[in-house]
Every structure is written in C-alpha cells, then in structure tokens.
C-alpha cells in the first residue's frame, strides 16, 4: 500500500496554465504531497487534480484503484493519481 500525506501547508493547489503546441489554452491544478516509497524519507511530489476538484484536505491517504489502468500492450500503468483517506 502506498502511503500519501498532505500536510496543512499543502492544503491548497496551484494552477499552471499556458498554450499547448496545438495552440489550445490549458489549465492544470496541482497539489503537493509526500509519498512514502519505502525509503528512509518520503518524497515530495505534485499530483494533478481533476477539473473542478477541490484540493485534498490535510491528512493521510492511500492511492485509489482507479489510478491504475492497463496499457495498450497489457502492461500496468498509472493514470491520474486519485487518493482516498487512509483507514
């Protein structure tokens, strides 16, 4: 199980926007969190939120199964990271 922690200082998202190579404007909401990958220290990462999704509240989370998908050639891939509160 992958453990994710959102600290109180990370309870908001930042918006990154611009124009794609195809000339279309885009906007992404990103939130910082720490992911425990089993090493000595957790790793600070950015997760992209779904459009209209509020920021995750501070707390402990795990990765929801909908974050994974099967790729074109049958390999397991990570899709957009979605979190659920840890029990």
Curated annotation (Swiss-Prot):
It comes from the Viruses. The keyword DNA-binding applies. The record marks 16, 21, 26, 34, 46 as: Involved in DNA binding. GO terms for biological process: DNA replication; rolling circle single-stranded viral DNA replication. The record marks 41 as: Involved in DNA binding, and in the dimer-dimer interactions of the protein-ssDNA complex. Homodimer. This is DNA-Binding protein G5P. The lineage of its organism: Viruses, Monodnaviria, Loebvirae, Hofneiviricota, Faserviricetes. The gene is V.
